[in-house]
């Protein structure tokens, strides 16, 4: 892992635990375990730190979802929602970091672009896993809804989304 990736990983953890508004750049420097000069060399603004953290988390999340992935179809969807539940429990108990960044920086074009790219990639992955590109946007909404509901509902949100996804892809919903 390069120094920049290592810093992005530590920034991801800091933002995940403390949110985007609370940590100052000095606190982020401490969390990244580098000097302020080194931090700014790799990420010249707090917004670029957010983008670096989001990019790192995006790659980590997609790798996590693909780990042990069965062939496209029902088993792959079940796998995805089970992995989502594990991710929420262990890595995102407060909800989706990308959406938190979007809310914290609503007008920042680079952050909006990073979040939008993450969401587009999720729709593409759902299309591939389900083998049903026609329902991928609806599957995406189930994925996002489960992520958003996690802090209140926990595993019940995941189970409900998985159940609805299976009904949707099997054609039991109109």
Show where each model-derived region lies.
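Helix-turn-helix
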Residues: 6, 10-48, 52
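Short amphipathic alpha-helical elements of helix-turn-helix/winged-helix folds
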Residues: 10-14, 87, 142
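Hydrophobic alpha-helical connector segments
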Residues: 52, 66-91, 139
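Short, basic, alpha-helical segments at the C-terminal edge of helix-turn-helix-like DNA-binding modules
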Residues: 55-61
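Short alpha-helical scaffolding segments that buttress acidic/His motifs in well-ordered protein cores
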Residues: 81-84, 98, 102, 139, ...
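Hydrophobic/aromatic-rich alpha-helical bundle segments in the mid-to-C-terminal region
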Residues: 111-116, 120-123, 129-174
